[in-house]
Each structure stands twice: as C-alpha cells, then as structure tokens.
Amino acid sequence: MKILVTGFDPFGGEKINPAIEAVKRLPDEIAGNQIIKLEVPTIFYQSAEVVKKAIEKENPEMVINVGQAGGRSAITPERIAINFQAGSTPDNSGKGPKEGKIQADGLDGYFTQLPIKKMVAAIRHAGLPAQVSNSAGTYVCNHLFYEIQYLIHHDYPNLKAGFIHIPYLPSQARNGRYPSMSLDNMVTGLTVAIETAAMC
C-alpha cells in the first residue's frame, strides 16, 4: 500500500512545526507500506490544492494529514471534519479565513475512514498518551481535513483519509506552561498509528 503523510510548515510566529518535523522523520516504509512524505503550507485552500496534486500524482490508497494542536497533551486522531472555517490568526499568506462554509454544496461533516479507536489503543499500548478527538477546530487543519474528505466523496470513493493532531514540542511549551511531547515519541506514535491504520 502507498500512504501519503503530510505535515504543515511553521505558522503563527513559530519557527518550528512538530507536524512536518515528525513526518520527515518517519521511515520510508512502515509494515511493508510505502510512505510518501509531503510538506504542506499553512494556508487556507492552498494546503488542499497541494495535497490534491500529490494524490493525483502518487495515487495513494491512504492519506494521513498531521497537524500541531498546542495545548493538547496526547496524540489525537480526529473523528470528524466540519464544513466551517473561522479564526483570528492569519495563515501564512497573511490573511485570515473567510468565516463560513468551506464547500457550499458539501455535507456539514465527514467522518474519517481511519480506525481511530484502534489507532488510539495501539498508541497507548506503545506507552504514549492518545485519545480520539471530536473537534479538529476551524483553522487550516480542519480545512484540509474537510477538503480531502470532500474530494474522497466526489472523486476518490476508495481512498481512506484522516487527520492526526500532535502536541507541542518541549521547545514550544513556554517553559512548561503548555503540555509537550518529545519528537521521538511523536514519530513513534505516528508510526504505530499508521501501521494500525494500514492493517485495517
């Protein structure tokens, strides 16, 4: 199986984004599955276009998008993408999102095709904190998650996709004011999650 795994570039004044740092360090093969790694710009609409082009080029059987969720203490696979965007923080184009629906003709929400409960159980079995999340927010992470689900439901019915949020790195934790996780643990957790998803 070919699996496309994406991570966002730094945004919001940060010099690093654990998403792309962890994705870059994933092995090129997990449990016999080829891992295609892709950096994605933290920009509304452009992020989805970059991933769509990669899907067209690579024709993967699975897509897993990874993003940073400052304030969370666990690796959190997302259950649902919602058809709404909002936010006060500009994206990396310097613009904020236009508040409202992402796709005018899209469903209010799309559920992931990934076995998120099994993924969480496997990550925990590896000794790392994990839990299912029921909200990917309304920023670029949810936007990308929704756009890929919209694409699946219209053009790629056999493609499986989902989104995983990871915590801050220790260097981003503002002297312990926020939860964090080491990069090595993030890579381990994502590897376990991907292996579990690929087996189902």
From Swiss-Prot:
Keywords: Cytoplasm, Hydrolase, Protease, Thiol protease
Catalysed reactions, semicolon-separated: Release of an N-terminal pyroglutamyl group from a polypeptide, the second amino acid generally not being Pro
A molecular function GO annotation: pyroglutamyl-peptidase activity
Keyword Cytoplasm: yes
Enzyme class of the recorded protein, top EC level: hydrolase
One CC-aspect GO term: cytosol
CDD domains: Peptidase_C15 (cd00501)
GO BP terms: proteolysis
Catalytic residues (positions): 78, 141, 165
Enzyme Commission number(s): 3.4.19.3
Principal cellular location given in the protein's record: cytoplasm
InterPro entries: Peptidase_C15 (IPR000816), Peptidase_C15-like (IPR016125), Peptidase_C15-like_sf (IPR036440), PGP-I_bact-type (IPR029762), PGPEP1_Cys_AS (IPR033694), PGPEP1_Glu_AS (IPR033693)
Subcellular location: Cytoplasm
Subunit structure: Homotetramer.
Protein role: Removes 5-oxoproline from various penultimate amino acid residues except L-proline.
PANTHER family in the cross-refs: PROTEASE FAMILY C15 PYROGLUTAMYL-PEPTIDASE I-RELATED, PYROGLUTAMYL-PEPTIDASE I
Family listed: Belongs to the peptidase C15 family.
Protein name (record): Pyrrolidone-carboxylate peptidase
Organism: Lactobacillus helveticus (strain DPC 4571)
